[in-house]
């Protein structure tokens, strides 16, 4: 019950998955993954199906969850801000065949509020470097 509360799911313990919002279904998936106790999380476009507002909220939620329960995460995403906000280290890949064209460090420390982080000058600078690397790919 305490995990449901921590994951923002209190009161929905017996709710069928089809009745949960997209963000809630994502939190259930992360809860299952964290309960498994694996030291490595592999996340492939975890927020791609969510609307922009829910995606930002879920990114902030995941950052806080990983701060509370640190794990190594391999995150695959096409969203540059998402990669930089959620990661300590970002590898920018070229088109097929994939090769590393740049390695960037995410902003540390991250503000608990995602919007406060992605508007900071250091974040904007890193984002511009990532976009430039993608363009040059």
Q: What is each residue range found by the language model?
A:
Residues 14-16, 114:
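Interfacial catalytic loop of ABC nucleotide-binding domains
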């Amino acid at each position: 019950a305490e995990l449901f509360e921590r994951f923002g799911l209190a009161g929905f313990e017996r709710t069928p998955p089809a009745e949960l919002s997209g963000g809630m279904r994502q939190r259930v998936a992360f809860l299952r993954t964290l309960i498994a106790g694996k030291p490595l999380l592999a996340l492939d476009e975890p927020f791609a199906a969510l609307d922009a507002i829910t995606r930002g909220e879920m990114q902030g939620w995941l950052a806080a969850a990983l701060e509370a329960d640190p794990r190594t995460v391999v995150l695959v995403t096409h969203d540059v801000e998402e990669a930089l906000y959620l990661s300590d280290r970002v590898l920018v890949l070229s088109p097929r065949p994939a090769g590393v064209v740049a390695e960037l460090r995410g902003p540390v420390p991250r503000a608990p509020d995602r919007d406060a982080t992605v508007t900071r000058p250091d974040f904007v600078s890193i984002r511009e470097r990532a976009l430039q690397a993608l363009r040059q790919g």
